[in-house]
Amino acid sequence: MGILLYPTISNLWNEYIHFVSIGHYEETVTELDTAEIDRLMAEARDYNANHTKNVIMDAFDDDNQYVLTHPYDTMLAVDSTGMMCYLEIPKLKEKMVVYHGISAKVLERGVGHIEGTSLPVGGESTHTVMSAHRGLPSAKLFTNLDQIVLGDQFYIHVLNEHLAYEVDEINVVLPEETSLLDIVPGQDLATLVTCTPYGVNTHRLLVRGHRVPYVPPEEPTVTFWEKMSELKFAIITLLAVLLIADIVFIVFRVRRKKKKR
């Protein structure tokens, strides 16, 4: 039973961690004074102004020896958790923490912002790129990213700003094909990257969006506590199946004993 429930329970635990982390982030941002928020945002925009070319590192390369650099590791940091912002994908009913960099440790627990790409604060001639795994037994993350279609939106919540991006390109490329992640002069872009095909991981799925006005979704993203009902349903269903199996097994044994007599 434990083996059967492991993916569901571990994923819900990961979502709980994201839920708590996002709540802590929002609370921390609320407690910051306006001057500090303005400083962090100005610092990030200055960084982007001096960053004119994206340099892409493959987050899913087994030989990835990525190490955070300074001062990148302090950009948009409101505390010492390594959290940069959080990503919301209404279509998938998911909210995910975005951390600095793409180390193996980061990608085991959340979304990683690829250092070498624009910081996720928007603006002309910027292109921020974020990566996450598919199919981790312990976390859903970008597992269902292939369900996104043109016209869908995703949001980046950073400090006290909410950036909306509408998907305008979906591409599948080889890991070394990174030209689609370049900065496009005058455009404000964001791309989500994961492995594909599912379980094979020889290519990369790129879901790109361009900046549009942010309008809060009419249907709010499902909260962790609402998702707990999924776990209850899974447990009840599994218990029912096991109960039926036990009954069938007992009936079978009783009939078998009667036949032997």
What is each stretch, according to the model?
Residues 221-261:
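C-terminal single-pass membrane-anchor helix
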